[in-house]
Amino acid sequence: MAKFIDQVKIMLKAGKGGDGMISFRREAHVDKGGPDGGDGGTGGNIYFVADLGKNTLLSFYKNKFIIAEDGVKGGPKNLYGAKGKDTIVKVPLGTLVYKNKKIVADVIKENHLYLVAKGGKGGRGNNKFKTSKNTAPRIAENGMPGEKYEANIVLKILSDVGLVGLPSCGKSTLINALSNAKAKVAEYEFTTLVPQLGLVKYYDYSYTIADLPGLIKGASLGKGLGIQFLRHIERCKVVIHIVDFGSLDKDPIQSYEAIQKELESYKLNLTQKPQLVVANKSDLANFKNNIEKFKAKYPNIEIIEISALNYHNVENLKKIIWEFLEKTSHLQIKIEDDFETEVKEINYEPDFVIQKMNQNHFKVTGKKIEELVLKIPINTFDNLMRFNNILKKIGVWEALIKRDIQKGDLVEIYQHKFEWEEEL
């Protein structure tokens, strides 16, 4: 059986955009051919898509670094570089992707591509920089880097119905009887270590059902399999509480109260969810006696009597669950953020920051400056002049002069180092 993993950190790196090209038309009988350097292709994106056959994030343990293909650089004759190939990753339904504590994607639909990392924009070729004043520009741009970050991947099983109960209450037997699931069944506790998903068909209708591993007292505090599985109940529309009413060594009242307490103690108070109580193991002799005791203490709780092993009343239970889902169809699944609420603030970050490292050394940084350095390669005189003009336009040179920069001083702009001249 696959190990159940429902939270993992991975690196995502979308493709870099292809570089633009510097090229000039060179053909026989064509005098003074103009610029024909093409643009680079966009970098590949990374998408997540739901796979109903998956119920664990185990695959990310084997591959914690996911990348997409880079875009191809532009070519001569105005040829555009090809777009980088997208990477599509199959994940369980109910997978959430977090970046810096903010939800990037919530995989809640089938057959839908969820963008989790965007590829970088391709650089422009020199054909795009032709003007009446510069008919032969030796200017091109680098492709921009694709989005890269450490993603926190969290799985919260997405199902119409969630089965809960103490170990060995018969949940696995019931999901097998109700659906197409093939959950492991045995006469010992904690047979279910991985949530099992099944599809229940009721005439022309269907709904999904999840068998969640058995809970024990203190689960809401993390005991046993604990809180790891309680969070999966958050995303179920309806909770079916299975109680063993037939075994001689089980007290159904205590069993019922123990689970209700754990559901109530969880941070979202899961007892507020629509809930059905199912009394299992009606084929055993002690069943009727326990039913009477339970009804005496909880006369207002409606219970559904079944034997999952013998399929007694299972078809009727399918109908009851469907009708219950229909009654609660107006309720929306509440998606709670496991992390701190992010407050959106206006970004007052300046275009650039100047630091005086010593008497003759100035350092220029900033998000806009970094983007400029990445975009413009200093490999031709025209590119250098463009780089210089943009810095001048946004006020970097004026700011350096106000900081009393002198001829010969060093100006460091990320990987570039220049010597200051009096006239720029």
From Swiss-Prot:
Family: Belongs to the TRAFAC class OBG-HflX-like GTPase superfamily. OBG GTPase family.
Needed cofactors: Mg(2+)
InterPro entries registered for this protein in UniProt: G_OBG, GTP-bd, GTP-bd_Obg/CgtA, GTP-bd_prot_GTP1/OBG_C_sf, GTP1-OBG_CS, GTP1_OBG_dom, GTP1_OBG_dom_sf, OBG_GTPase
Residue intervals of the OBG-type G domain: 159-326
Organism: Mycoplasmopsis synoviae (strain 53)
Residues annotated for GTP binding in this entry: 165-172, 190-194, 211-214, 280-283, 307-309
Main location as per UniProt: cytoplasm
Function as written in the Swiss-Prot or TrEMBL entry: An essential GTPase which binds GTP, GDP and possibly (p)ppGpp with moderate affinity, with high nucleotide exchange rates and a fairly low GTP hydrolysis rate. Plays a role in control of the cell cycle, stress response, ribosome biogenesis and in those bacteria that undergo differentiation, in morphogenesis control.
Keyword Hydrolase: yes
Known partners and oligomeric status: Monomer.
GO molecular function: GTP binding; GTPase activity; magnesium ion binding
Every Obg domain range: 2-158
Protein's name in the database: GTPase Obg
Subcellular location: Cytoplasm
Superkingdom of the source species: Bacteria
Gene Ontology process terms (BP): ribosome biogenesis
Residues annotated as domain OCT: 344-422
Enzyme Commission designation: 3.6.5.-
